[in-house]
Amino acid sequence: MLVALYKNQFVDMVGDSTKEEWVAKNKEGGLLCPVCQSKVIPKCGMKKTWHFAHRSYEECAGFHEAETNYHMLGKKGLYKWLIALSEEPIVEFYLRDIAQRPDLFLSKHNHAIEFQCASISQDQLRSRIQGYQSLNIQSDWIFGLKRLTHKGNFLHLIQSTDLSAAKKDNAGNLFLHYYCPLQDQFVLLRNILPLSQRKSAAISYRFSSKNFNYFQEVSQTYNEEEFLHYKNLWLKQKTTWRMTAFKNTSPSVMYFKKVLYFNHRSLTLFPPLAGVPSNGYYHFETSPYLWQTYLLFMIEKLSVSLFSINFIEQEFERLLQKRILQVRDFPYINESWKNAMRGYLHFLERHKFIEQVTDQTWKKLRDIHYPKTVEEAFKLDEIFSEKS
């Protein structure tokens, strides 16, 4: 940790105090943990970032995870960056009501900033976000750049917890922020489109901390010309889905393969209208080609042209309970898988397959076309990609 109590005053390791000054304070025995009031020792070595450490190994309620040198460097770097923006950050401010200690707290904005380097579960993430929300505190997660893997043009491996912390920009696109304290650089991921459980298409922007104003950039919409490249990535992903469906043995794939097989359909030859990035599709962690194909199949099997959205929702809820379908958790986004389902229905409406009659009722306009061969499927995917 970077903060301690000395004579009932907060002191920190981000200032200009010398090693000799910390040694003198330590000899007086007056350096205490602000949370548990136990004595702490100033660690002022040559290799690691200067910090305070507890004398004993007793658990302190104010700390949830061991700190690495990378994490402490990041906190110091972010602190100096905010100071340069004329902000007044408080390092490791302890919020006793919720027993949480954000890495940086901006009291003027009532805003907590977490620099996340260690592993954290999605349940822990949601719990911390809800803790801040219970005190009407805004919060943001900035992730250590080590957590992000760049796989090529517009392609990244994003950890599932990182993706859960995503917010929407002014255009409704997902975004995340990363920071590298070793390079003192921010990496902004914009227009994030998940392709699989970890793989996502995203546009990355690099900024030196000197050229990045968080409060101006946080929800700004960036140039979307790169979306042309996304089409190629998505087309490749659809090809992958088609080529691997027959040998994929996951419970979700096996279930939908079985349903289609008994209705004389092949999952490999799913309709070109399925497996598309419709509005909010990412609320399902299950691949879009699976749940969208099944939704089309449900509509196809209707004996009448009119259908209620409740009919589809009830069936999807059944599949969710059986864990055949999986969803993603986005604590910052006030939406659910039902938004993904409605987004896809509106997508089908734009392509003249269905039309909305009332808020809850839709009408089937024409039959869905299934490719008869893999070659035809690839060709239709390409044609559909160019049109959409």
Named regions from a protein language model:
Residues M1-E87:
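N-terminal cysteine/histidine-rich coordination modules
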Residues L78, P102-S121, Y132:
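Conserved catalytic cores of phosphodiester-cleaving nucleases, focusing on short active-site segments
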Residues W81-I98, F105-S107, Q116:
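A short acidic/basic microdomain associated with nuclease active sites
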Residues C117-N170:
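Catalytic cores of nucleic-acid endonucleases
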Residues D162-Q220:
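A conserved mid-domain beta-alpha-beta active-site/ligand-binding segment of alpha/beta enzyme cores
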Residues I203-K258:
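Eukaryotic partner-binding/assembly regions in large regulatory complexes
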Residues A245-S388:
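Extended, amphipathic alpha-helical scaffolds
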